[in-house]
Amino acid sequence: MRFAILAFIALPAFAAPPTTCGANDDYGRALCAYQRRNFAEAEAGFRQIVEKGDADMQTLHAIYFLARTDMKTGHFEEAATLLIRIYGLDKAFYDTWDCDFLLGECRRASGKE
C-alpha cells in the first residue's frame, strides 16, 4: 500500500491548459501565450491589438496585459507608460484592475520610488 501511495505521489502533475487556449481570435491567442509564459508571442499579439487602436474593451484589456507582459520581462518603464495610458482611457478600469498597485511596482522596480 505504501508503495502505491509513493508511486502515485511521484507521478508528474499535468495541468490542464488555460481555458482561453481554445480561442481563435487574436486576443485569445495572445492571452493563451501569456498564460503559458510565452511572453514574446504574447507581447506581439497584444501589441498588434493595441496598435489597431480600436476604442473597445478588448483593446483596453490588451493594453493591460501588454503592461503585465512588459513587467514580466523587466520592461517596467514601458509598463508604467501603458498603465498611465489606461488611467487616461478608463479610470474605472484602472481602479477595478488595480493598476495603481502595478504602477507602484513598476516605479519601485525602476528606482523611482
Describe the predicted segments one by one.
Residues 19-20, 50-59, 86-98:
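Short solvent-exposed coil/turn linkers within tandem alpha-helical repeat scaffolds
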